[in-house]
Amino acid sequence: MATQDDAHLAELKKKRTFRKFMYRGVDLDQLLDMSREQFTKLLPCRMRRRLDRGLKRKHLALIAKVQKAKKAAGVLEKPATVKTHLRDMIILPELVGGVIGIYNGKVFNQTEIKPEMIGFYLGEFAISYKPVKHGRPGIGATHSSRFIPLK
């Protein structure tokens, strides 16, 4: 009896179910089948207005390059990196699965586009500044710093 329960529990652990990705109540397969106009209706206002004005030639070229790289890659391979300076590009469903090198002003940060990134800007995934790491205060920084011994 106990072995059957153990076997049943082990079988349940093997069949782990993962949460299916949904963007505003629509799963990824349906997002990929949608036209751009239908997808635009799901976006927040700022991005919806941006896409309603139309994508520029550079943005359309980036989408085409990413799709070409995804098509050229093998079944279980990562596609080739597509480098871009377009930090203001909105991540669309057709970009999911691609690898994009996003320029941060110094280097290209490689980023694999995942479904959770849909609706964000590319620039949000390549930080353009080095976060401040506060060290010791310098001389004259505060009145109490007069009593801090020099190195």
Curated annotation (Swiss-Prot):
<comment type="function">
    <text>Negatively regulates lifespan.</text>
</comment>
<dbReference type="InterPro" id="IPR023575">
    <property type="entry name" value="Ribosomal_uS19_SF"/>
</dbReference>
<protein>
    <recommendedName>
        <fullName>Small ribosomal subunit protein uS19</fullName>
    </recommendedName>
</protein>
<comment type="similarity">
    <text>Belongs to the universal ribosomal protein uS19 family.</text>
</comment>
<dbReference type="GO" id="GO:0003735">
    <property type="term" value="F:structural constituent of ribosome"/>
</dbReference>
<dbReference type="GO" id="GO:0003723">
    <property type="term" value="F:RNA binding"/>
</dbReference>
<dbReference type="InterPro" id="IPR002222">
    <property type="entry name" value="Ribosomal_uS19"/>
</dbReference>
<dbReference type="Pfam" id="PF00203">
    <property type="entry name" value="Ribosomal_S19"/>
</dbReference>
<dbReference type="GO" id="GO:0006412">
    <property type="term" value="P:translation"/>
</dbReference>
<dbReference type="InterPro" id="IPR020934">
    <property type="entry name" value="Ribosomal_uS19_CS"/>
</dbReference>
<dbReference type="GO" id="GO:0008340">
    <property type="term" value="P:determination of adult lifespan"/>
</dbReference>
<dbReference type="GO" id="GO:0000028">
    <property type="term" value="P:ribosomal small subunit assembly"/>
</dbReference>
<keyword id="KW-0689">Ribosomal protein</keyword>
<dbReference type="InterPro" id="IPR005713">
    <property type="entry name" value="Ribosomal_uS19_euk/arc"/>
</dbReference>
<keyword id="KW-0687">Ribonucleoprotein</keyword>
<dbReference type="GO" id="GO:0022627">
    <property type="term" value="C:cytosolic small ribosomal subunit"/>
</dbReference>
<feature type="modified residue" description="N-acetylalanine">
    <location>
        <position position="2"/>
    </location>
</feature>
<keyword id="KW-0007">Acetylation</keyword>
